[in-house]
Each structure stands twice: as C-alpha cells, then as structure tokens.
Amino acid sequence: MRLCDRDIEAWLDEGRLSINPRPPVERINGATVDVRLGNKFRTFRGHTAAFIDLSGPKDEVSAALDRVMSDEIVLDEGEAFYLHPGELALAVTLESVTLPADLVGWLDGRSSLARLGLMVHVTAHRIDPGWSGCIVLEFYNSGKLPLALRPGMLIGALSFEPLSGPAVRPYNRREDAKYRNQQGAVASRIDKD
C-alpha cells in the first residue's frame, strides 16, 4: 500500500523520509510528490563504435563507455538542454532523496510530457530502500520535435511504498552499490557488475 499525502508529510516531518529541498505542500499530491529537473546532464558523444559488448571483459566495457559518454554537462540558470528525436540522455532530479530501509520509492514521468514523446525513465523507476542521493533520469525523446528541458521544471512524481519490514541489505549498506550518494548524472557502471 502506497503512502498518501498525509502520510508522506508525516514521514517528512518525522525525518523518516528526506527530500531536499523539502517540497512545498502544493507539490505533495494524493499519493505522490512532484520532483523537478536538476541542471546536470550526460549524453552520448559522436562516436564510431559499432557496439558495446556488455558481457565482455570489464576493462574493455569500461573503456568503451568512457569513449561514448560525454562529460557531465552543467547548465546555468535559464539555459535549456535540447533533446532531439531518437536521442537518449541522462539527467538528474533537483531534489536529493533519502529513503529508510523499510520504504521503496517509485518514479513516474508526467503524462503531459509523455504525450510529447518524452520518456523520463527508460526502465529504472524503482528507488531502493536505503537509497540516498539525486535520482538519475533516463530521458528518451520518442517524439517528432526537439524538446527544450530547463532546470527547475516539473519532470516527474515519486510515490512511496512501505515494506513488510526493514530490508536486511538496504542500498546504502551494500558493498556493490554502484551509485551510492550520487549527486550528478552518473553514466552506466555496468562494468562494475
């Protein structure tokens, strides 16, 4: 059962759930909290790689990822990031979220953006118990026109679901947690699997 707005506010007030900066009450809806787009992005560079062998030797996968991913792009206030049709880009939420070991989060994109062809998360919309950091967004423009994305715009909504008990291996305590405490648009770390 997901938390309702009243319970989301109570968990925030009690410090069991942290969203920083804390959203105003107007952004806490029936069962969700609106999140905004941050100012950090990462894209695929122009490259000549025919493919990336995801199951190949880890050092080769790592080198291939380094060749095809851009450095982090940080926008100044008022600047726009343009996502063209058929392009994939990583971005980050403005808000940093910390979940306790007994709560899982879910990110959903906005329907109004999806109707323009913008996918906010390609597949990864679960936020694990024990997570702490900004949430990386996996943007894909499946529409026909470039989309201008500006930091601060509403980009999605988080919902929260209590677990039957605290996780024994929450994300923040796992040795293999590849994206622990991320604050930027961190590229794939599949080579760490």
UniProtKB/Swiss-Prot annotation:
GO terms for molecular function: dCTP deaminase activity; identical protein binding; nucleotide binding. This is dCTP deaminase. InterPro entries: dCTP_deaminase, dUTPase-like_sf, dUTPase_trimeric. Pfam families: DCD. It catalyses: dCTP + H2O + H(+) = dUTP + NH4(+). The active site is at residue 138. GO terms for biological process: dTTP biosynthetic process; dUMP biosynthetic process; dUTP biosynthetic process; nucleobase-containing small molecule interconversion; protein homotrimerization; response to radiation. Changing residue 111 to T: 30-fold decrease in kcat. Shows altered dTTP inhibition. The lineage of its organism: Bacteria, Pseudomonadati, Pseudomonadota, Gammaproteobacteria, Enterobacterales. Catalyzes the deamination of dCTP to dUTP. It comes from the Bacteria. Disruption phenotype: Mutant accumulates dCTP. Homotrimer. Its EC number is 3.5.4.13. Pathway: Pyrimidine metabolism; dUMP biosynthesis; dUMP from dCTP (dUTP route): step 1/2. DCTP binds at residues 110-115, 124-128, 136-138, 171-174, 178, 182. Belongs to the dCTP deaminase family. Inhibited by dTTP, which binds to the active site and stabilizes the inactive form of the enzyme. Inhibited by inorganic phosphate. Keywords: Hydrolase, Nucleotide metabolism, Nucleotide-binding. The keyword Cytoplasm does not apply. GO terms for cellular component: cytosol; protein-containing complex.
